[in-house]
Amino acid sequence: MTGMTSNGRRPLLNRRLTEFGTTIFAEMSALALSTDSINLGQGFPDTDGPEEIREAAVRALRDGRGNQYPPGPGVPELRTAIAAHQKHHYGLSYDPDREVLVTAGATEAIAASLLALVEPGDEVIALEPYYDSYAAGIAMAGGTRVPVTLRPHEGRFRLDLDELRDAVTDNTRLLLLNTPHNPTGTVLSREELGEIAKLAVERDLLVVTDEVYEHLVFDDAEHVPLAGFPGMRERTVTIGSAGKTFSFTGWKVGWITSTPDLVTAVRSAKQFLTYVASGPFQYAVAEALALPDTYFEAFRADLRAKRDLLAAGLTAAGFEVFRPAGTYFVTTDIRPLGESDGFAFCRALPERAGVVAIPNAVFYDHREEGAPFVRFAFCKRTEVLEAAARRLRAAR
């Protein structure tokens, strides 16, 4: 019978998830361990965030704040801090009691948003390459993934707005955006976002915008929230995260801001995923969001220096480097090295050079588009990046 295994039973895994096996991150991290390589694959820092924020978490634990189930929408202190953050940095006003929802990291926020807002047969447009959980979330919701590809143009990966417009059909329910963009490091400009906003209003689309790298922008780049454009607040779910901004990725504290109706919809799905999460850490993140602007400026400056260090090392090793305007990833083209298959290159790199990277093709539906591109993370200590650069140059 169709869909049955050799023993006559249905496959154990839901068919919506059959394309999602072991992630490339697990595979490459295992390679890093077995070869004693420097892991520049997965995007997490190798140092903790501010000491005063760690101590805030310790105080919450000791004081018994959050050790039992916190409120479903998140503790009031954190919801208030998130609303204040959006007002301070972007001039966006949100009611902390009705328009803010705390989640178990941004990945749950993405999944809950898609499960709440997408029905089987709905089309969801995503900019490829994209964070791999987007594809899984769309699949679990029963939606149809429609990729619009960012392509290299004048040193950056660029969105073709005409291609985006052409991708919208009568079945399009939602745009899933990410800026600053992982893995390319592109930051969508105010002009690009303005055109996206016009399209969303014209075609009456919902938008889920993943802005977890909002404070990781460099040089002249500016992060502009899509929710601030005319007609967008009432149709946009904005996702944020403490992990990227404060270097506490293991705490898994994320959030959404949106209208009361959209927050209620997303909470309806979220409550059956983790119910609640990260109680004591929520109090610490509330304090982190209130850190002075000097913290965010110093954080950006530190990452900018690390970006420049790794980019220079990769260039010296023969890669073509796409200098990122945001995030903590740098995408490279391996064709100047005489290579064209990112998968094969990354699987061989630990033995050849003692460095781990990620093939960008895993972030594409159209794998051939991403075949020659490889991603490195620069959210590591300076001495680690220097050692990686030396190894890559030596293996050239």
Where are these regions (language model features)?
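PLP-dependent enzyme catalytic core of the Aspartate aminotransferase-like
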Residues: T2, D166, A348-A357, V362-R396
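N-terminal small-domain helix-loop-helix segment of the aminotransferase-like
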Residues: T5-R9, N14-G105, A112, D160-E163, ...
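Conserved core segment of the aminotransferase class I/II
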Residues: N7, F229, R233-R304, G313, ...
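Helix C-cap/helix->beta junction micro-motif
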Residues: T35, A141, E202-R203, A317, ...
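Conserved PLP-anchoring active-site segment centered on the Schiff-base-forming lysine
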Residues: A116-I138
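Active-site phosphate-binding strand-loop segment of PLP-dependent enzymes
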Residues: V146, L150-D219
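Conserved glycine-rich beta-strand-loop-beta hairpin in the small C-terminal domain of fold type I
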Residues: A286, D302-A311, V321-I334
